[in-house]
C-alpha cells in the first residue's frame, strides 16, 4: 500500500482528501503546516505529499524547498493542491520540485487523474 501525507491547515480539506485517497488504497498521514510535515516526512517517509500553499508556521513552498534539500529523506512525489492559481505560483512550485499542481476546489476524478499522471496509481 502506498502512503500519502496530506498537508493543509484546513481540517475539512484534509478530511475530504483523506476520504478520496483512502478509497484509492493509500495509507494516510496528516499535518497542519509545513513544519509538522517535515517531521512526518523524516519519520514516515511517505510516497507522496498532497500540499497546500498558504499555511501558518511554514508555507507549502518553504516546506518543499527544505524537503528537497534533505538528502537523507526519501523524496516523495509532491502535488500542490491550492487556491493559488496564477502562473507565478505554479512556476515557483515546479522550480522548487513539485511534480504536479491542482487547483482547489478539487474532486475525486481530478485527484485520481493527477495521481495517475505522476505514476502513483
Where would I find each of the regions flagged by the language model?
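Receiver (REC) domain active-site loop signature in two-component systems and cognate sites
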Residues: 55
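C-terminal output helix
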Residues: 106-115
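Acidic, metal-coordinating helix/loop segments flanking the phosphotransfer/catalytic sites
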Residues: 30-48
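Two-component/phosphorelay signaling modules centered on CheY-like receiver
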Residues: 11-29, 118
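Conserved Asp/Asn-Gly motif in the active-site loop of CheY-like receiver
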Residues: 31-35, 90, 108
